[in-house]
Amino acid sequence: MQREPNVLRNVINLGVAPSCGSDLETAFRAVSLDGQSTEPFGFGRAILSGQGTGVESLFSSIIMLRDGALNIRDNNGLEITLTQGEVASLPAGIFSWEARAADCVILTIHQERLSVSFGKLDLDHPMSPGGAPNPALLTTPAPTTSRHEFQSDDPIAWGIWATTPYARHPITYSFSELMMLRRGEVTLSNPDEGSVTFVAGDIFLVRPGAVAAWDNPSDLEKFWIIHSPS
């Protein structure tokens, strides 16, 4: 993907990425590179409209809805309806769908034996204390943080996280993290490349090799997906 102005290397703003498809079948194929990818996951933005049946996904996936409405049904007749800011997990399988200008980000997980249920994630699930940043990196007083994990199997996990304001020095990322901000804003920066700010509603991916400091000036909440190489 072409680098956008003022975006750090290996930091991708998925909300401004070109749409990879207007129907779910095309989007699944594009995101998973037709099932031939050796990458741990695929990702992309799609703007879906219309409906379809018999759509196969070879991989488990996470769908995050930025705008519009999306209804998905599995072969057992279970149904999910997503609206703005909602997230669903899907196992590999066959699906029917109906969408109205559904602007979404899809992540497919190229990992065998991963147990993923079909359902909408409860992003308001109670959180427990945890997920604090490394104290040695802080440039402000330590924040108060909390988290909840929906999936914690190595090498991929996802959940929700909240923090009070804090800032830290740049780190070089050795893992991938996709973030969907639900509240607040954050600025990622480094001295050589500048800075980029993301706000509530943005979905972005930080890939291995990115160098970024973190600064959230107000309370922040996010949905996150992390892949840590073995």
Feature names for model-found ranges:
Residues Q51-L58, D74, A99, G159-I160, ...:
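Short histidine-centered beta-strand/loop micro-motifs
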Residues S57-N71, T172-L188:
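Short, conserved beta-strand element in jelly-roll/cupin
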Residues A92-S115, P208-S230:
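Ligand-binding loop in jelly-roll beta-barrel domains
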